[in-house]
């Protein structure tokens, strides 16, 4: 082994705002924040799950177009699409794309795509 996983860093225009969005979405605690960086940790884990860093002149990904590629996205496992969708939209997400039996695509407030996923019954 060369090393161990530390965290995923996401570029954005406002780290605090995006950290609040993902904190509510994932039930994680915001443990570090200042003007240029914010970090989330999941309950019971001392390591950051996600970190957000301010980028000047941030250009959000364009999904599904690849004019500005998404480069990565987060999958969030859920139990009920309708309940989860209402919650993420209330947090400031935007629906992006059509529904599938196993996933739905949204954009976070900074424009990064993420999916709500539910295994088929």
Located regions from the model:
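N-terminal beta-strand motif that seeds the catalytic metal site of vicinal oxygen chelate
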Residues: 1-19, 71-76, 117-121
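Core segments of cupin and vicinal oxygen chelate
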Residues: 2, 9-54, 83-105
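Short secondary-structure boundary/capping segments
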Residues: 41-42, 63-66
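A short, acidic/glycine-rich surface segment
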Residues: 57-63
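Mid-chain, well-packed structural core segment of small domains
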Residues: 66-88
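Short, acidic, Ser/Thr-enriched surface-loop or helix-capping motifs
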Residues: 108
């Amino acid at each position: 082994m060369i090393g161990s996983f530390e965290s995923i860093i996401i570029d954005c225009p406002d780290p605090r705002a995006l950290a609040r969005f993902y904190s509510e979405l994932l039930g994680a605690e915001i443990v570090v924040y200042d003007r240029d960086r914010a970090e989330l940790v999941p309950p019971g884990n001392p390591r950051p799950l996600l970190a957000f860093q301010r980028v000047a002149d941030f250009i959000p990904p364009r999904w599904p177009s690849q004019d500005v590629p998404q480069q990565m996205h987060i999958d969030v496992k859920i139990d009920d699409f309708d309940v989860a969708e209402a919650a993420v939209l209330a947090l400031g997400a935007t629906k992006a794309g059509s529904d599938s039996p196993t996933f739905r695509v949204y954009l976070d407030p900074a424009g990064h795509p993420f999916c709500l996923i539910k295994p088929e019954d």
